[in-house]
C-alpha cells in the first residue's frame, strides 16, 4: 500500500524511492509487525482475561501443565493482526502470491478461531468436530491450489524442485494440486500438534519463515535463481515481506508466550501459521525444503502417527505420551529444557536446509 503512495510522491522528493527497495521494506515489515504485537499484546491479554477465555488443560497430561489452566488463549489473533497489517502496509498489493498466503492465513485463522471458541467459550471439549475442521481446511487449500495451478500451469511455478539435484525438476501437471493440498493441510496440522509448550511452536515458525525469506529473495532474483539452479519466479520477491512480517509478529508474540506464558496462541494461531508456511513453500517450489527446515514439525507429527498406529496394531505405545515433546516432559525434562533444545534443533535444520540450495 505504502509502495504505491511512495511511487506517487517520489516525483516530489527522491527520498521516497527507498520504499521501492525490497530489503528496506522487508526490514520495516518485520519491525512494524513486531511493534504492533508488542503494543497490542498487553491489551489483548487483558481483554482475554476479562472475557475469561482461558486455556483448557487435559487431565491426563503432565502434572506441570495443570498450573496453566486459565491462562488466556486465542492469542493467535495478535499474530494474525500483526502479520496482516504489516503485510498490507509494505507489500505490492497486485502480487498474487501474497494474496494466496493471506487468504490461507486468514481462512485457517477463522477455522482455528471457531475451534477455540467452541472449546473455551462454549466449554465443548471437542471443539470444532474433526471432520468439519478438515473439510474447511480442505476447501481453502484446494481453492488456493486450483488458483495457483491456473496461474502457473506448465511453467516453473508448477515444477518440483528436488534437493541435491540441480537438473531434476519434473513438471507436476495436475498432481501439483494434490501436492499443494497435502502440504498446506499437513503443515497446518503439524504446527498445531507442536503447539503444546510455552514458545515451542512459535520459535521454529520464526526460524522457518526467516529461512523462506532468504529463499524468496533468491527465487525472485533472476541472477541468484540461476546461480542456485532453482526456478526463477517473478512474483516470489514480495513473499519476503510476508515472511519478515511473520518473523516480526512471531517475536512479538514470543515476548508474552515465553515460559511461563502469559498467553497461548490457540488453534487460531497454530493452524493459520502452519497453513501460511505450507503455502509459502508451495509458491516457492520448495516443498522438500519445508520438510527439512520444518523438521521439528515433521517429527512431532510422525510421533503422533506412530503412537496411534502402534497402539491400534500392537496395543502398545512407543512413547510415554505424544506428541513427542510430552514424552520428554514425562521423562523428567523441565519444560524450558525441552523448549530450548527443540529451538536449537529447529535452527540447525533451517541452516541445513538453506545449505542444500547450494549443494547440488
UniProtKB/Swiss-Prot annotation:
Membrane topology value: Multi-pass membrane protein
GO cellular component, one term: plasma membrane
Keywords: Cell cycle, Cell division, Cell inner membrane, Cell membrane, Cell shape, Cell wall biogenesis/degradation, Magnesium, Membrane, Metal-binding, Peptidoglycan synthesis, Transferase, Transmembrane, Transmembrane helix
Catalyzed reaction equations: UDP-N-acetyl-alpha-D-muramoyl-L-alanyl-gamma-D-glutamyl-meso-2,6-diaminopimeloyl-D-alanyl-D-alanine + di-trans,octa-cis-undecaprenyl phosphate = di-trans,octa-cis-undecaprenyl diphospho-N-acetyl-alpha-D-muramoyl-L-alanyl-D-glutamyl-meso-2,6-diaminopimeloyl-D-alanyl-D-alanine + UMP
Chaperone listed as a keyword: no
CDD domains (UniProt xref): GT_MraY (cd06852)
Residues passing through the membrane, by range: 27-47, 71-91, 94-114, 132-152, 168-188, 199-219, 236-256, 263-283, 288-308, 338-358
Main subcellular location of this protein, as a coarse class: membrane
Location(s) in or outside the cell: Cell inner membrane
PANTHER family: PHOSPHO-N-ACETYLMURAMOYL-PENTAPEPTIDE-TRANSFERASE, PHOSPHO-N-ACETYLMURAMOYL-PENTAPEPTIDE-TRANSFERASE HOMOLOG
Family under the similarity heading: Belongs to the glycosyltransferase 4 family. MraY subfamily.
HAMAP family per record: MraY (MF_00038)
Name by which UniProt lists this protein: Phospho-N-acetylmuramoyl-pentapeptide-transferase
Organism annotation: Photorhabdus laumondii subsp. laumondii (strain DSM 15139 / CIP 105565 / TT01)
Gene: mraY
